[in-house]
């Protein structure tokens, strides 16, 4: 994929000048780290509520068995954004798309922070999910700005920012909620998101449009006049035609169902006796999964060396094993911390591998492919969130653990079943 860049001082010649970012040269040093920061901040908004579920449920009088709907609606909004907004990354100027969505995300966060009742809260959270998909457009942007030989590292760096954002989301959310109330979490995030929009407007190339191989314009469904509806529908067509995309998407659904099962459900046993932890302490457990950020970078380097299949298998095996210590949460917080480290490491290793592998299938359709893949991610997260709440109501933490382990084992078995198929899953 080539990137057309123009309108920036100091870049002349060719599509974007010899100093322009793209497959033939590295992006400016500050762009990928800034994209990583913005990705992490955007995705964090989806996870702020996790350590606050008990607080929000009590504040807005939600049934304990259905408190997971807070996360589920946010994830459903995210899924809608993946289908409706992410494909625009292959159609429009990505700089305007990224900065515009960040600005709207800031407004949605403001709406959450000022919500007067449950209905307004849930609508605003769905809007946050819808607009937080800007992170996936930024992943595709980072991949497009980087030469193929270094693309795995760039995707790993940006995905590492996402992982770090998820982890810090829980910790920061808990701390701010204890210090200034839960509303402060969303109001501070709204201001930070607005600042990032301004910074990226200055840092990204003035014009960024996807192109096909050899610099030709990227394929437009229905020709150059193809409608937006056809463009969105083409995402479904891509997954219907490419078995590798469907396999990797299903793996994402199962892996993130397991991920969401843990992080949606864990607030309840930690806030109940014998632990009775505060929001700050509950959020701090998200830091136990900091290994996930390390996994993102390691997986990116392994993928650049052609080890995607091995990375997938090891990651899924570790994911299954992580539920053994997680199941001991009622007896030991150290066991939960150890299990969270293993789970986050495994999930992010598989996630980075998935994104690197699927982008190579059709580079000129990178935004649509990543958007379609992340629909599976979001569906799995919504399934895990709702399933976790229902499982806890039915059988407590042991039932939640069993559900998460079942999702993880299903992913490992799917990967094993496809080892002898063509194309391989990694």
Regions found by a protein language model. Give the residues of each.
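Helix-to-loop junctions at the C-terminal end of transmembrane segments
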Residues: 81-93, 295-308, 392
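Juxtamembrane intracellular "pre-TM" segments in multi-pass secondary transporters
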Residues: 17-26, 205-249
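Conserved MFS/SLC helix-loop-helix module at the cytosolic interface between two early adjacent transmembrane helices
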Residues: 80-118
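C-terminal transmembrane helical hairpin of 12-TM major facilitator-type secondary transporters
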Residues: 309-354
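Cytoplasmic helix-loop-helix junction between adjacent transmembrane helices
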Residues: 125-162
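C-terminal membrane-cytosol helix-exit motif in multi-pass small-molecule transporters
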Residues: 190-212, 414-418
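Helix-loop-helix hairpin linking two adjacent transmembrane segments in secondary transporters
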Residues: 156-202
């Amino acid at each position: 994929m080539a990137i057309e860049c123009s309108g920036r001082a100091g870049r002349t010649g060719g599509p974007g000048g010899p100093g322009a970012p793209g497959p033939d040269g590295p992006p400016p040093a500050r762009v990928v780290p800034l994209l990583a920061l913005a990705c992490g901040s955007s995705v964090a908004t989806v996870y702020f509520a996790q350590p606050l579920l008990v607080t929000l449920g009590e504040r807005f009088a939600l049934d304990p068995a259905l408190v997971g709907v807070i996360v589920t609606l946010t994830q459903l909004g995210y899924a809608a954004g993946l289908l409706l907004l992410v494909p625009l990354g292959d159609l429009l100027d990505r700089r305007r798309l990224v900065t515009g969505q960040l600005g709207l995300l800031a407004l949605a966060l403001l709406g959450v922070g000022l919500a007067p009742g449950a209905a307004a809260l849930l609508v605003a959270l769905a809007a946050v999910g819808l607009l937080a998909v800007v992170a996936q457009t930024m992943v595709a942007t980072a991949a497009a700005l980087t030469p193929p030989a270094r693309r795995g590292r760039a995707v790993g760096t940006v995905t590492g920012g996402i992982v770090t954002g998820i982890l810090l989301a829980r910790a920061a959310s808990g701390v701010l909620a204890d210090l200034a109330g839960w509303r402060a979490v969303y109001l501070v995030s709204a201001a930070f998101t607005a600042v990032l929009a301004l910074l990226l407007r200055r840092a990204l190339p003035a014009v960024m449009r996807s192109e096909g191989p050899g610099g030709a314009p990227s394929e437009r469904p229905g020709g150059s006049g193809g409608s937006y509806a056809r463009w969105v529908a083409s995402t479904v067509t891509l997954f219907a035609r490419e078995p590798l995309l469907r396999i990797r998407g299903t793996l994402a659904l199962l892996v993130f169902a397991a991920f969401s099962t843990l992080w949606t459900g864990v607030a309840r046993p930690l806030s109940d006796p014998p632990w009775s932890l505060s929001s700050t302490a509950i959020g701090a457990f998200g830091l136990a999964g900091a290994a996930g950020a390390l996994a993102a970078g390691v997986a990116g380097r392994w993928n650049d060396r052609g080890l995607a299949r091995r990375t997938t298998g090891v990651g899924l095996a570790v994911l299954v094993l992580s539920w053994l210590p997680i199941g001991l949460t009622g007896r030991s917080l150290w066991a939960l911390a150890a299990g969270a480290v293993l789970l986050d490491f495994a999930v992010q290793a598989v996630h980075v591998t998935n994104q690197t592998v699927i982008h190579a299938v059709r580079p000129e359709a990178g935004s649509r492919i990543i958007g379609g893949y992340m629909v599976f991610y979001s569906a799995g997260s919504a399934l895990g969130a709702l399933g976790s709440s229902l499982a806890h109501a039915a059988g407590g933490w042991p039932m939640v653990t069993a559900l998460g382990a079942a999702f993880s084992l299903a992913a490992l078995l799917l990967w094993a079943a496809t080892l002898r198929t063509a194309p391989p899953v990694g």
